[in-house]
Amino acid sequence: LEDGAMCVALSSGTSAIMYSLINIMSQGDNFISANQLYGGTYTMFDNILPEYGINAKKVDITNLEAVEESIDEKTRAIFCETITNPGLVVADISALSDIAHSKGIPLIVDATFTTSAIQKSFDYGADIVVYSLTKWMSGHGRVIAGAVIEKGGFEWGNGNFPLFDKPDTSYGGMRWGHDLGDLSNVAYSLRLRTVPLRNLGANMSPDTAFEVMSGLETLALRME
C-alpha cells in the first residue's frame, strides 16, 4: 500500500517506533523529534530511550530552521507524525526530507493517522514509515499490531551509522551497510528483522496478521 521495498510486521505500533530507532542508534546518539506526538510515543522518548542513552531532541517540527539547527554529528534521524495526535499539526514531509537528506540521515514518519489511503509518505521523501496497525489500518479494534516499512535505496553505509559499518558479531561479522550486495537496497529492513526483531521478539502473531489483512480490505472505504 505504501509502495515500499520491504515491510516488517510487529506486535504493536510502540514496538514499531522503538525498533525503527534502535535499528540505527545506540548509546550516545540522538534524533530530532516533533515536540507534539502521540502520548505513548512522548513517554517512550522522554522516559524509556534516555535510559539507554538515546535522546530525542524535541523541536517545533513546523520551524524548519530550528529543525536543521538541532542536528549535530550524533543525530541519526528526524522523526515526525504525518498529522500529530491529538494536536493535528501537519508535517511538511518534503521539507523535512530535504533537511534530513542534506545531512545524510533518514526521515522516519509515523503515518498511523493518515494511512496510505490518504497519503503515501514515500512520495514526499520519507525513508521509513511506521504504523500502529491497531487503529485505522485494522479498523475493528480487535488487535494490537504495528509495522515498519522501508522505501528502499537509502545509503546506510554513508558513515553516519556505526551500527551499519562495524561487523555484527551476532551475525557472522556482517556489515549491514556494506556486505549485502544486491540486497543493500533493503539493508535497514534486513537488519531490523535480524537484530531487533530476532533478539527482542516483538513479532506479530498469525491471528493478528489475519485480522489486519481483513481490515485492510475495507481501508479505502473507511478512510473516505
Name each model feature, range by range.
Residues L1:
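Glycine-rich phosphate-binding segment of PLP-dependent enzymes
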Residues M6-E224:
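Conserved PLP-enzyme active-site core in the AAT-like
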